[in-house]
Each structure stands twice: as structure tokens, then as C-alpha cells.
Amino acid sequence: LLVLAENKELFQENGIEPMVSELPFIQACRDKRNTGTFLNSHDIRVPAPVDKYHPTFPLFAKPYDGSLSKDLYVVRGKEELTSEILNHPKLIFMEYIDKQEYKEFTVDMYYGKDNRVKAIVPRERIEIRAGEINKGFTRKNYLVRFLKERLDYLPGVVGCICIQLFY
């Protein structure tokens, strides 16, 4: 998406209209610290941050710029908080959301050129491979209304965006 957004004018000069969000939105979403701020600003709760030097357990750590489920850590106690995890320069630390208590969803949202959401498709994550859903259930549920109320209009957002949520 970043390459498409950076070259949007080049595409348009050649008669191609890429359905891609504006560059500032894409750049912000590439850093999970910004994504949390964005979601909070739209009344969507995110896991609480955890101070890695004064942690509460269990906690979850992941790279702020990560993808493909790489370098993800569930730390259940002090003995599991290794120096490798503590000193990893890109990890952010947050409260752990127990998948036994909450279901995890990937939600695809499609935005038109008017920056309004046109479709919201929640998929329950059953089996994951390399960070992507391998098995899932598409379910219309409360998330459709919840997200429509909060993210119906997003200036600069066009095409598909994807959000992972617990519900």
C-alpha cells in the first residue's frame, strides 16, 4: 500500500485510479503505536500499555512495525521476561488479551471515494498461519454496528483497510 500511495500521481497520469488511502494515513498505520492512538481517538479500546521495567503479567509484546506474526511474545511471568525481549528495540508492551475469554476477529472495511465505509466484514480468526487467517468464520455481529458508528467517515481513507479486534 505504501508504494501505491507514494506513486498515486504516477498512476493517475497514466489513466489508472488506484483505490488506496492517502499517504499520511498509510504511514500512520504502519506504526502500531499510532494505530492505538487512532483507535482510541475513535472510542475503540486497545490493550493498555505495560511498563516493561515495572510489568504486570501476563503481558504481550510485539514490534511496533511488525507483520506476519514475527517476534510476538506472551510473557506470563517475570521468569519469561528475558533480556532478549527487554532489550528488543522495536517491541511495545501491552496487556495480554486472553483468547479463551475473547474471540479474535479480522475485520475488512471497504471505503469509497467519498471516504465513507461501504462494507464491513468481520471474520473470526480460528486458525492463523504467518499472521494471516487460514481458517475463519465470517459473521455479521455487533462489530458491524460498533465500527460503523465509530469509523463511518475517515478523511483520506479509500479502498480496503483491515483491523484486528477482540470481542
Q: What does each model-found stretch correspond to?
A:
Residues 9, 37, 149:
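Surface-exposed charge patches
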